[in-house]
């Protein structure tokens, strides 16, 4: 997006994008342990944002790694109990209770699940060397 502020910290209707994601998981299962993985350099900033925007969702914060794989691995290491694990990109705040319910039910039934949302094709008008997006 080209912002100086990382996407997960942008405000969406008075709350950070990451906070909105956390709130959906907490509402789905208040006993769930949420683990937030962030670059080490962003952890204190996140804690400040939690205080400023009243992010009261209980969660554990761990340092990420060099690559996404390393960050997921660090998050997995922070898990203290056995159970089904959901890995969610916190900059995707439009996760719904239904998505979580379907994902967890499928994982319980088959051992794993990968939720997805169908992509929407865009309509473009090409005029010589340029193109523009058309309203649907």
Where are these regions (language model features)?
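Conserved core of the sugar-phosphate nucleotidyltransferase
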Residues: 95-136
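Acidic helix N-cap motif at the loop->helix transition within catalytic regions
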Residues: 44-49
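Residue-level signal for inorganic ion chemistry
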Residues: 9, 18, 75, 88-89, ...
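Glycine-rich phosphate-binding loop at the start of an alpha helix
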Residues: 19, 69-73, 97
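N-terminal glycine-rich phosphate-binding loop and ensuing alpha1 helix
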Residues: 1-43
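Short active-site oxyanion
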Residues: 31-35, 58-59, 111
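Structural beta-sheet core signal
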Residues: 36, 87, 112-115
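Short phosphate-binding loop-to-helix
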Residues: 51-84
């Amino acid at each position: 997006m080209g912002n100086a502020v990382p996407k997960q910290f942008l405000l969406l209707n008075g709350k950070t994008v990451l906070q909105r994601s956390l709130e959906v998981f907490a509402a789905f299962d208040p006993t769930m342990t949420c683990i937030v993985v962030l670059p080490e350099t962003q952890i204190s900033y996140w804690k400040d944002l939690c205080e400023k925007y009243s992010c009261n969702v209980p969660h554990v914060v761990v340092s990420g790694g060099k690559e996404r794989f390393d960050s997921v691995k660090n998050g997995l290491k922070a898990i203290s109990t056995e159970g089904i694990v959901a890995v969610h990109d916190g900059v995707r705040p439009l996760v719904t209770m239904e998505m979580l319910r379907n994902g967890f039910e499928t994982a319980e039934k088959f051992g794993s699940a990968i939720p997805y949302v169908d992509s929407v094709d865009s309509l473009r008008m090409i005029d010589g060397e340029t193109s523009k997006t058309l309203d649907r």
